[in-house]
């Protein structure tokens, strides 16, 4: 599933379905093309010779399998370095006023939040996910948010609360299975990932009562992450005017 969004310059940009650990890279890929006409796909779809954000982030030690667990100033600087002549990115405190100011100025916000099963923000502290905020709606305090290849309308106060609720995560294990084997696996690079209970127990973390044909040697460990420090209370803002708001508080 995906949607096509026309930017102010008249370019059509596809926002692809982004689920599982690569959701942040899909969000970033959309932002770079929408604002700066920089076309770097989130993943290479199995072509190891093709440039992708996932390949670059892995090479530079910023991700294990494609997860983006960082909205700090160091990540903002890393993203800017992808193309310093074009990209304006800053880590700022996630609050309604900053979101509205950025969107009204023609920028975009990448906001981490806790997503529920329907795609809306919740306050569980778990299931950290990324959305891209596009523009403020006429209804006060709401904005268009893109994720999962769809556009949604989010209440910004609820989104801010959801962002601040993000909790730390324990060590995770992800293994590869043949593509399209199961509908609940996460497609990455031509194979599918499922979260395993441990690095040796290939039972699905979500308690599905099925054995998994895990590819030998494919299980990757994502270390425990202090998301309450690297994601909660923060967001990444992108502007197309080549300047950052001097009043914004860097995170």
Label the predicted regions:
Residues 9, 51-189:
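Conserved active-site-adjacent core of cysteine acyl-enzyme catalytic domains
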Residues 1-4, 204-206:
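Intrinsic low-complexity, intrinsically disordered segments enriched in polar/basic residues
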